Curated annotation (Swiss-Prot):
Residues engaged in binding ATP: G115, T116, N117, G118, K119, T120, S121
Organism: Shewanella oneidensis (strain ATCC 700550 / JCM 31522 / CIP 106686 / LMG 19005 / NCIMB 14063 / MR-1)
Enzyme Commission code: 6.3.2.-
HAMAP family in UniProt: MurE
Upper taxonomic lineage: Bacteria, Pseudomonadati, Pseudomonadota, Gammaproteobacteria, Alteromonadales
UniProt modified residues of type N6-carboxylysine: K224
Molecular-function annotations in GO: acid-amino acid ligase activity; ATP binding; magnesium ion binding
Domain of life, source organism: Bacteria
Residues reported in the UniProt entry to bind UDP-N-acetyl-alpha-D-muramoyl-L-alanyl-D-glutamate: L25, S27, H42, K43, V44, T157, T158, S184, Q190, R192
GO cellular component, as recorded: cytoplasm
Enzyme's top EC category: ligase
Record protein name field: UDP-N-acetylmuramyl-tripeptide synthetase
Function per UniProt: Catalyzes the addition of an amino acid to the nucleotide precursor UDP-N-acetylmuramoyl-L-alanyl-D-glutamate (UMAG) in the biosynthesis of bacterial cell-wall peptidoglycan.
Homology family: Belongs to the MurCDEF family. MurE subfamily.
GO biological process: cell division; cell wall organization; peptidoglycan biosynthetic process; regulation of cell shape
Designated gene of the protein: murE
């Protein structure tokens, strides 16, 4: 419990003596004794639900106002109190941090990871490594939030500001040593992480995605860069193999954090890098170099991009104070992240690889990685999401056609759009559309490719990854591509 006046004290005085339990942005989730934050939203205005919130037992409602003269205005009603808060939408994270404090410098360090691709893998690798060293790790991101191995589906890459601060507070109370958090561009722009005391930030890469929201690549990049300007930040890690990372190295010279570079291509400005890289059927071997020395590592993860993700995770944990040699010793015991370059092999020696790749760059990276492990034909089965950036559809087709031997274009969360039209949009990017296979039913498409494949072939199933649904006509249908791949591998 907390006094309402203590919650509001950083912004304005309040004389009431009410206590409350939790904060919430969802009027449907209110329990007696909670405080409801009524904000204007992207689709719905929460201020429409003030009466409902009070009727359900809310102690108080904090009401967003754009009028500075209304700051601290109080309306007392029989069911509860309404308190006006100037530009509350901009302060939700800070308000949540008062109720659910996470104190920087205590036992838990927070690693924030941003970038178009690699956020999930890097965060999961951080958590695995901490756990392998007998620490306690938590993850927040696409695969869910929670202690490592106990993730609960979150719905968004970056949770809302209140959920986020409440969970960080709980993690700290549970003795978590490291929380690895995926930080989306949406989460940064919308202020959901404003009060999070990040101590290490990681940038993985930047390629075309979410332009339906950000408008152009410049705005998208600026959103990502916000993470490296937090006052709490002690260290920033930039992928210097990405041109944006190199540019940011110069742009971020005057931020509070110390900025470091990492590279799997031995970039001359990188403090953390790999050399003597050797890929094989079992993964990759390399020499890891960091400011205090070098050591050989052997990773079971496929592809150069996973080596980059691993290097990012190792470097971030080292900057948090962990011993690099101890970390490197645990690398052979890492397991692939669910739905990220996850392999299933049939009795006929056909390899199906389930991956979340859903951008042109991710398709290219995944196919390039698999080419090293493919003795036969390299296939790519993919689609594009509906109600999203239409401009990337032909680019997805271009990437698949250029880096795979055979392609099958199918559905991938058409949402409210016609899946056949999305397939047509993708095919516009092909140089030789007559060579592409198309099948709107994703299961049928995959089965058709498996039936045509031969021993030594590799089939990339791109786009779904860990997801357990296929969304069409606004309805989410149960669909688990990992389970399908496992079933097909066991049937052969």
């Amino acid at each position: 419990m907390m006094l309402l006046r203590e919650l509001l004290a950083p912004w304005f005085p309040y004389a009431g003596e009410q206590t409350f339990l939790d904060l919430t942005l969802d009027s449907r989730a209110i329990r007696r004794g909670d405080v409801f934050l009524a904000l204007p939203g992207h689709k719905v205005d929460g201020r429409q639900f003030i009466d409902k919130a009070l009727a359900q037992g809310a102690t108080a409602v904090l009401v967003h106002t754009d009028n500075p003269q209304e700051q601290g205005k109080v309306i007392v009603a029989e069911q509860g109190v309404q308190i006006y808060f100037y530009e509350l939408a901009k302060h939700v994270s800070a308000v949540a941090a008062v109720r659910y404090p996470v104190i920087q410098g205590h036992a838990m360090g927070i690693v924030g990871i941003t970038g178009t691709n690699g956020k999930t893998s890097t965060s999961q690798l951080c958590a695995q490594l901490v756990t392998l060293l007998s620490g306690k790790a938590a993850v927040m991101g696409t695969l869910g939030n929670g202690l490592w191995g106990e993730l609960v589906d979150s719905g968004n890459t970056t949770a809302d500001a209140i959920t986020l601060m409440r969970q960080l507070h709980e993690f700290a109370n549970k003795g978590v040593n490291t929380c690895a958090m995926e930080v989306s561009s949406h989460g940064l722009v919308q202020g959901r992480v404003d009060a999070v005391p990040f101590d290490v930030a990681v940038f993985t890469n930047l390629t075309r995605d979410h332009l339906d929201y950000h408008g152009d690549m410049e705005n998208y990049a600026a959103a990502k860069q916000m993470l490296f300007r937090f006052d709490s930040l002690r260290h920033g890690l930039l992928n210097l193999d990405d041109p944006i990372g190199g540019a940011w190295l110069a742009e971020l010279k005057n931020v509070p954090a110390k900025i470091w570079g990492f590279s799997i291509e031995a970039h001359k400005a990188a403090a953390f890098y790999t050399k003597n890289v050797r890929f094989n059927d079992q993964g990759v071997q390399a020499t890891l170099v960091w400011p205090e020395g070098e050591i050989d590592i052997s990773s079971p993860l496929l592809g150069a991009f996973n080596l980059s993700n691993l290097l990012a995770a190792l470097s971030a944990l080292y900057l948090q104070g962990m011993d690099m040699r101890a970390l490197a010793a645990k690398v052979p015991y890492l397991v692939p992240v669910a739905g990220r370059m996850e392999r299933f092999t049939t009795a006929d020696n056909i390899t199906l690889v389930v991956d979340y790749a859903h951008t042109p760059d991710a398709i290219e990276q995944a196919l390039n990685a698999l080419r090293r492990h493919c003795a036969g034909v390299l296939w790519c089965v993919f689609g594009c999401g509906g109600d999203r950036d239409k401009g990337k559809r032909p680019l997805m087709g271009q990437a698949a056609e250029q880096f795979a031997d055979r392609i099958m274009v199918t559905s991938d969360n058409a949402r409210s759009e016609d899946p056949n039209q999305i397939i047509t949009d993708i095919i516009q990017g092909l140089t030789h559309p007559e060579r592409a296979l198309t099948e709107v039913d994703r299961v049928a498409a995959i089965k058709q490719v498996v039936a045509q494949a031969k021993s030594g072939d590799v089939i990339l199933l791109a786009g779904k990854g860990h997801e357990t649904y296929q969304e069409a006509a606004g309805v989410r249908h149960d669909y688990d591509e990992r389970a399908l791949a496992r079933q097909l591998s066991e049937q052969s």
